[in-house]
Amino acid sequence: MRYKAIVEYVGTGFSGWQKQMSAPSVQEELESVLSFLLKEKIAVNVAGRTDAGVHALGQVFHFDARESTLQPFQIVNAVNYHLKEKLIVLLKIEIVDETFDARFSAIRRHYQYKITNRKTPLAVFKNRSWHVPQTLNLDLIREQAQYLVGKHDFQSFRSSKCGASNAIRTLDRLEVEKNGEEMIFHASAKSFLHHQVRIMVGTLVAIASGKLMSVTEILSKKNRRYAGPTAPPCGLYLLKVDY
């Protein structure tokens, strides 16, 4: 029997989604409690592995298990009871067709990146937003962001550890909204390269600060060293996954 689950979590304090030998991970916490509740070894398969410090509001994973006396809503309640101190919350579980795959059935992934643009440091939103103290040119950010939308070779916008066979991706959306001192980047695509969203944000901030050339020039270079810094993980949220 295959289950589809939606989970939210605060990435601070975790080594990321993926299970690690010597550091806590979201995957390990979920597999441990699900295995305990369902009385069998559970392995979860995720839509997209988030890095250390990255958060999720709508991460999706699937797992297989024998038929259980527990109903899906009971599994949700039990998991949340056991993980109440971990800042991991299971939002929903449902039984799905066995052809469903959290990663390969996905047609679009949506991310948000949050910046707090003010001079004073953060307290409440520390580790939930990137604090940028310098004044940013919002119009320039929005203008340059649109040059990233569409199908491009994003070689300049992936980390050196990226394992993808090529850097060609289609970015469906990259929009920026501002509400007071908060700036939110909305990015959507079927798939992203490793650190792509964070490098795009870091590059746009560098351009808006007058430190870098234009996005079109950076794309044409096809070299990571021409793009801006990788924005810190604390501002990135996996918002939802479409199927």
Curated annotation (Swiss-Prot):
Enzyme class: isomerase
Binding site for substrate: 111
Classification via SUPFAM superfamilies: Pseudouridine synthase
Domain of life: Bacteria
GO aspect biological process, one term: tRNA pseudouridine synthesis
Active-site residues, Swiss-Prot/TrEMBL: 51 (nucleophile)
Catalytic activity: uridine(38/39/40) in tRNA = pseudouridine(38/39/40) in tRNA
EC number per UniProt: 5.4.99.12
One Pfam family per UniProt: PseudoU_synth_1
Molecular function terms, GO-annotated: RNA binding; tRNA pseudouridine(38-40) synthase activity
Record key words, sorted: Isomerase, tRNA processing
Family classification: Belongs to the tRNA pseudouridine synthase TruA family.
Free-text function comment from the UniProt entry: Formation of pseudouridine at positions 38, 39 and 40 in the anticodon stem and loop of transfer RNAs.
Known partners and oligomeric status: Homodimer.
Name of the molecule in the record: tRNA pseudouridine synthase A
Species assigned in the record: Neorickettsia sennetsu (strain ATCC VR-367 / Miyayama)
Lineage: Bacteria, Pseudomonadati, Pseudomonadota, Alphaproteobacteria, Rickettsiales
